[in-house]
Amino acid sequence: MPPTISDDTTVRSFTCAQPLGRAGYELIIRQMLHRFLSDLHTTKALLDRSLQATVNHAAGPVRSLLTIITVGFYTLLNWCSLGSYHTTKMISTVVTGLLLLASGCEALPTNQTPLPGKWSTLPNITLNGVEYPRQEHAAALVGDEIFVLGGILPWDGKEYATTNIVQKYNMITGTWTETAPMPAALNHANVAVVDGKIYYLGGLEAVDETYWNATGKSAVYDPATDEWTVLPSMPEGREIGSAATVVVDDTIYLPGGLAYTNITYDQEGTVSRFSSYNVRTQEWTTLPDLPAPRDHAGKGIYRDMLYILGGREFGNKNVVSTVFGFNLTSQQWATAFEPMPIARGGVASATIGSLIFTAGGEGDRRTPTAVFPEMQAYDAATNTWVDYADMPLPVHGSDAVVYKGEIVIPGGGIVTGATLTPVVQTFQPPLPDSGEKSMPLMVMVYRVVFDLPWMLFKR
C-alpha cells in the first residue's frame, strides 16, 4: 500500500524534518538501484520512506502532482510483484530518484541549525572491481590502509553466507585490493590491532543457514607478509562474538558479546562475561563480569577507563542506553555515567581524544527500517553527550576506524536485520571553536595540555 500522504511521519532518517541533503538522497538512490534487481521487499521499504519524504515536503499543486505520481508508482510496484519486472523496477527507480532530487528536501527548515560535522564518502567496497556489500564485519587500520574482515554477504535465496574474505582500502592510492583470507569464516569477529598486526579472537560462525554460534578460533595477520598465523583458541566456555573489543598496550579486552544468534526465531544469547588476552605472553585472563549482559555495544578507552555504551540485551529490539565503565587500575565496574540520549545497538564507534563517537545502529522504532541516523559522542572528560550531523545513509552492523582525525565507516546494513551496503562513509568532526582547523592538530593540543600531565603523574 502507498504511504499515508497526509501523515507527517516522525521518521528522522527519511523525512525532511531531518533532511538528508542531496548527498544522502544520492546514496539512497544508489542503494535502491543496487537492491532493485535482488530484493523487491527491501526496495519497497526504502522507497516507502523516500517517497513519503518527498510528498510530505511538497505543497500545493506540487503536492497533488507528487500524490498522483506516488499512487502510479505503487501501481507499477504492485505489477512488479506479479511476474518478470526488471524493466519496470528500473523505470520506477529512476522516476523516484528524479523526484527526490527535484523536491527540495535537501533544504533545512528555517528554524533549524545544522548540527556540526561533515560527512563524505570513499569509493565503495569492491572485490575484483565489483561492488561487494558487507555487514557484521570488522574494520582495522594499519598505517594508511583500512581492512574489512569477514562478515556476511547478501542473501542468496537461502542464507546470509558468512565469509572469510579480507579486503583493504589504501587511503593514499584510493584503491581496494583483496588480501589473504582469514583462516576461519566469521561474522561479528572480535578484532584488534596491536603493533601493526591484526588479531581476531573469536566471533560467530555459521552452523546452518540461520544459526550462528560463538567460536574461540583465533589468529593474527601480518600486513607486511600478507600471512595469517593461527593462535590457540579462546579458553573453553569463554567463546564470544560481537564483544566490545578494545586495546590497551599489549592487552586486548573483550567485554560482553554473543554466545549465539538464531535468526529464524530472533533469539540471541547475550553474555556478561569479560576476558582479556595479552599478545606478548599469549595468556588469557578472566575479569569481573559486566553489570548486565551486553552485545553490539559501542566502546572506547579514555585514560584508565574502558567504556561500554548502549548495545542490546537478548535481541535487536531490546536496545539499551546505559553506559558502563571498567576501571583498568582498580579492576572494578561503575555505572554512574550519563546514558545515551537515544538507546541504540549495533553502532559503529570510534574514539578521538575524550570523545567516543557512536554512529547509526538499529532498534529505531520511529521508522520501519529501524536504523538510526544519529551520530553522537560521549565526552568522557565531562560525562556529557554531544550531537553531531546525522549519517547521510543510516547503517548498523558496521565498524569504524579513525584515520588522521577522520572517522571511516565501511559498509553495514541499511534495514534492521541484514540488508547490506558497499557504501563507505566518512565523518570529519569539527573543532569546538573553529571548523577551519584540522582535527589532528586539535587532538595533539588536547593531549599535550590534558593527557600528557596525567600520564606523567600516573607513572
Curated annotation (Swiss-Prot):
Sorted alphabetically, the keyword list is: Kelch repeat, Repeat
- Which pathway is recorded for this entry? Secondary metabolite biosynthesis
One short Pfam family name for this protein? Beta-prop_ATRN-LZTR1
Describe how expression is induced or repressed: Expression is under the control of the terrein cluster-specific transcription factor terR.
Please describe how this protein is used in biotechnology or industry, per its UniProt record. Terrein shows anticancer activity on various tumors including cervical carcinoma, ovarian cancer, and head and neck cancer. The secondary metabolite acts as angiogenesis inhibitors through the inhibition of angiogenin secretion. Terrein also has anti-inflammatory activity. It shows an alleviative function of age-related inflammation characterized as an anti-oxidant and might therefore be a useful nutraceutical compound for anti-aging. Terrein may enhance osseointegration by decreasing the level of ROS and has a potentially synergistic effect on osteoblast differentiation.
Does the keyword field hold Repeat?
A: yes
Q: What happens when the gene is disrupted?
A: Impairs the production of terrein.
| Kelch repeats: from-to residues | 92-144, 145-196, 198-248, 251-304, 306-354, 355-405
What this protein is reported to do is described as: Kelch-like protein; part of the gene cluster that mediates the biosynthesis of terrein, a fungal metabolite with ecological, antimicrobial, antiproliferative, and antioxidative activities. The first step in the pathway is performed by the polyketide synthase terA that produces 4-hydroxy-6-methylpyranon (4-HMP), orsellinic acid (OA), and 2,3-dehydro-6-hydroxymellein (2,3-dehydro-6-HM) by condensing acetyl-CoA with two, three, or four malonyl-CoA units, respectively. 4-HMP and OA are not pathway intermediates, but are rather shunt or side products.
Q: Which PANTHER family match?
A: KELCH REPEAT SUPERFAMILY PROTEIN, OS02G0202900 PROTEIN
Protein's recorded name: Kelch-like protein terF
Supply the gene name: terF
